[in-house]
Curated annotation (Swiss-Prot):
UniProt source species: Shewanella sp. (strain ANA-3)
UniProt family annotation: Belongs to the universal ribosomal protein uL18 family.
Name of the protein: Large ribosomal subunit protein uL18
CDD domains: Ribosomal_L18_L5e
Coiled coil regions in record: none
SUPFAM superfamilies per record: Translational machinery components
InterPro entries assigned: Ribosomal_uL18_bac-type, Ribosomal_uL18_bac/euk
Keyword ATP-binding attached: no
Pfam family, one: Ribosomal_L18p
Amino acid sequence: MDKKTSRLRRAIRARKKIQELGVNRLVVHRTPRHIYAQVINPEAQVVAAASTVEKAVKEQLKSTGNVDAAKAVGKFIAERAIEKGVTTVAFDRSGFKYHGRVAALADAAREAGLQF
């Protein structure tokens, strides 16, 4: 089993547990160049989204693949989710380690007002 398959298996296991809770989830995906975040409701509809690909986010950054970029995305996703009336979420790290950019995004979202 390779690294990606292991990560996807962890992600599926976590998503099943979140699905049983029936709450909104903050999903994070990262690539070496970008980081993406979405708030998805229990009916699997995207409520809010933010990423380093977006022009509004990218203009504020020097680089899109670092911790500062993840913090910016965390702040944007929290603002957009709260704007739509979502304040409480479950954090879905998609099988990635809670470390570095993933942790930075989560901390920034918490500071901006999301609860998880």
